[in-house]
């Protein structure tokens, strides 16, 4: 039996590519295994006859190592199932066969070493390392971490790897090379292969984001910019000069805010603004200023007229009490009287003792328009309103309250509006002015109109 097994090992180059190693070994020795003897160990050179029945499988069985796998994957393995062996030979013959078997086992180990060298030669050439490896962190294993090793190996070797001893056969040919990390190439980094380096800056903004600044030197062709900075801020890239001013300066921003505030204040000063745009606000403000100036002139004329009236009445009283000498003094006082202003000069005329009064005022709202003109003691009023109510009755009541004598009234309908024209005269002893007449009419007519309009709208 030992001679057959010795010939079996001599014929064996490596394992069968279509049969796993463990299954083949078990199938070849299962039939030749004798009954299990007591657990005894045979020592070389021993002459004891009690250890003759040595278990042959313990001597012939050997374990696979990482160096044994390449040879096993290159040469087919042939096994022949022999018939049941005869009874075991004597111990002396078994001892001699064991010595020959150990010699053949050493020869087999040399074959595995040669196979390992062939497997190393199959790996990539370590003398020429590509430049791409210097830019990457090389893993300790050449295979991908989520890749099964059987996809890169031959079919026969994948069958061996599928067994329970596949972990002992795994081997990485690049592990023993231990490539050092090479310094990066600055020229390749300038072309865009990497942005982080010595001249790169990483900053953290106030919101917790990361800003990466990459500086390009003067020798690089940067398209006309002397000093360029690439800024990466939360995924947004901006290219431009380093010292770049904002589009809107603080002075311009403050000026715009100041103008908006002034327009808002001007709108609040207008009594009844019709539109909210800036052009309309400015136009209505100009009209309102002119109106105020006319009102001031009107007040000055009224004050001067009253003062002149008091002066005349006082002089007349003196004439009634005294004689002719007093009349001469009155004429001298009248000649010596001088007006205190230009308005006084226009109102006071020493030749005929007459004063000319002239004023004009216009007020307008969304639903009502009032135009008042005063020439001496005659007052002309024009009133326009939407045709919701008849405002003629309320207007006549207001004229009676202002002590205006109504001489003529004309009216008509123009589209969706009523238009009325009133010709009145100021009664003697009455003190009225254009702004007072317009404001009173606007207040009364607007109140009656809002009461007539339903609450749900027009």
Curated annotation (Swiss-Prot):
Swiss-Prot/TrEMBL induction comment: By UV treatment.
Keyword Nucleus: yes
GO molecular function, one term: DNA binding
Acidic residues bias (residue ranges): 324-334
SUPFAM superfamilies named in the record: HLH, helix-loop-helix DNA-binding domain (SSF47459)
Cellular compartment(s): Nucleus
Domain named bHLH: residues: 243-292
Region (Disordered): 1-49, 315-338
Keyword Transcription regulation among UniProt keywords: yes
Keywords: DNA-binding, Nucleus, Transcription, Transcription regulation
One GO process term, biological-process aspect: pollen development
Cellular component terms per the entry's GO annotation: nucleus
Oligomer status and interactors: Homodimer.
Protein's name according to its UniProt entry: Transcription factor bHLH10
Organism of provenance: Arabidopsis thaliana
């Amino acid at each position: 039996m030992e001679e057959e097994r010795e010939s079996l090992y001599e014929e064996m180059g490596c394992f069968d590519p279509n049969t796993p190693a463990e299954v083949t070994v078990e199938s070849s020795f299962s039939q030749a295994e004798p009954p299990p003897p007591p657990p005894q160990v045979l020592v070389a050179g021993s002459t004891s006859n009690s250890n003759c029945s040595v278990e042959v499988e313990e001597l012939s069985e050997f374990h696979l190592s990482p160096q044994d796998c390449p040879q096993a994957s290159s040469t087919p393995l042939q096994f022949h199932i022999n018939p049941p062996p005869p009874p075991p030979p004597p111990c002396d013959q078994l001892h001699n066969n064991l010595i020959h078997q150990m010699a053949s086992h050493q020869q087999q180990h040399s074959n595995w070493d040669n196979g390992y060298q062939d497997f190393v030669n199959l790996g990539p050439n370590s003398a020429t390392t590509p430049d791409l490896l210097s830019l990457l962190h090389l893993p300790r294993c050449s295979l991908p971490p989520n890749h099964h090793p059987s996809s890169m190996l031959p079919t026969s070797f994948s069958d061996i790897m599928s067994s329970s001893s596949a972990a002992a056969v795994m081997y990485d040919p690049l592990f023993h090379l231990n490539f050092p990390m090479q310094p990066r190439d600055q020229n390749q980094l300038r072309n865009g292969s990497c942005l982080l380096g010595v001249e790169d800056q990483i900053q953290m903004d106030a919101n917790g984001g990361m800003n990466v600044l990459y500086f390009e030197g003067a020798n690089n062709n940067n398209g006309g910019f002397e000093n360029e900075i690439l800024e990466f801020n939360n995924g947004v890239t901006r290219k431009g000069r380093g010292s770049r001013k904002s589009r809107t300066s603080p002075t311009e921003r403050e000026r715009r805010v100041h103008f908006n505030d002034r327009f808002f204040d001007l709108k609040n000063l207008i009594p009844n603004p019709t539109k909210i745009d800036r052009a309309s606000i400015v136009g209505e403000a100009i009209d309102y200023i002119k109106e105020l100036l006319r009102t001031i002139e009107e007040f000055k004329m009224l004050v001067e007229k009253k003062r002149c009236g008091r002066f005349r009445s006082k002089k007349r009283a003196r004439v009634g009490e005294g004689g002719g000498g007093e009349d001469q003094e009155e004429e001298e006082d009248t000649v010596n009287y001088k007006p205190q202003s230009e308005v006084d000069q226009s109102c006071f005329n020493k030749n005929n003792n007459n004063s000319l009064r002239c004023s004009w005022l216009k007020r307008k709202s969304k639903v009502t328009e009032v135009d008042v003109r005063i020439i001496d003691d005659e007052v002309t009023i024009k009133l326009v309103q939407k045709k919701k109510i008849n405002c003629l009755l309320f207007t006549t009541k207001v004229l009676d309250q202002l002590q205006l004598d109504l001489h003529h009234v004309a009216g008509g309908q123009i589209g969706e509006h009523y238009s009325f024209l009133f010709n009145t005269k100021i009664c003697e002893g009455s003190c009225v002015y254009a702004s007072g007449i317009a404001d009173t009419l606007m207040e009364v007519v607007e109140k009656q109109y809002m009461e007539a309009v339903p609450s749900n709208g027009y």
